[in-house]
């Protein structure tokens, strides 16, 4: 006998401050894969997916990227990794300030570690090669374990905006043994490396804790 399994989708209006408190109290009811739809101050709609969570925290990443291509580093160098990159500055200045105030107020400042032993504090960041793929093909950035959500290749594919076309986007990691290339994810959800001065899309990634 065949079995029909149906998924019930519910939509609820949320208040970021209240949700953040529930996340801290472990009473949010969120689960990996849940989506919160939000708009930037200039009207760009994005779906923020819960990709990972634990006691007192939840990590959100935009299902797709913002419709702007940016260089990892304008000088075409990868020295210093994400911590010293132009793309980190872009995310934490231009993109962060484009988010609604209610959301900005609950995004945590977190420490992000990288392959050269350095770390930096930021509110918005990019996933590393190891978080996306587990094994690192291009970097030596194995600081973090693979996020369960990204074990499904389809979840690594991001469009150039909500409702757009699958596109390339930067990861945080830089290519080992090469001074000019950084890791990116292609439109099929696979990892490659590209020159730091090239413009690629970026997702919005943050933690509430």
Which residues does each PLM region occupy?
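Collagenous Gly-X-Y triple-helix signature in extracellular proteins
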Residues: 2-209
């Amino acid at each position: 006998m065949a079995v029909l399994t149906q998924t019930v989708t519910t939509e609820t209006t949320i208040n970021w401050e209240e949700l953040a408190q529930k996340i801290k109290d472990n009473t949010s009811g969120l689960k990996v894969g849940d989506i919160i739809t939000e708009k930037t101050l200039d009207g760009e709609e994005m779906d923020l997916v819960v990709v990972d969570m634990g006691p007192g925290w939840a990590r959100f990443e935009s299902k797709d990227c913002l419709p702007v291509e940016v260089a990892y580093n304008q000088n075409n160098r990868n020295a210093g990794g994400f911590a010293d990159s132009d793309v980190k500055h872009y995310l934490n200045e231009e993109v962060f300030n484009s988010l609604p105030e209610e959301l900005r107020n609950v995004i945590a400042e977190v420490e992000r570690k990288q392959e050269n032993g350095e770390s930096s504090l930021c509110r918005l960041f990019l996933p590393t090669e190891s978080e996306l793929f587990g094994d690192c093909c291009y970097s030596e950035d194995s600081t973090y374990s693979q996020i369960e959500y990204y074990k499904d290749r389809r979840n690594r594919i991001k469009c150039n905006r909500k409702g757009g076309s699958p596109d390339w986007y930067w990861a945080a990691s830089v290519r080992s043994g090469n001074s000019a290339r950084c890791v990116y994810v292609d439109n099929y959800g696979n990892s490659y490396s590209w020159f730091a001065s090239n413009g690629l899309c970026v997702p919005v990634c943050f933690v509430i804790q």
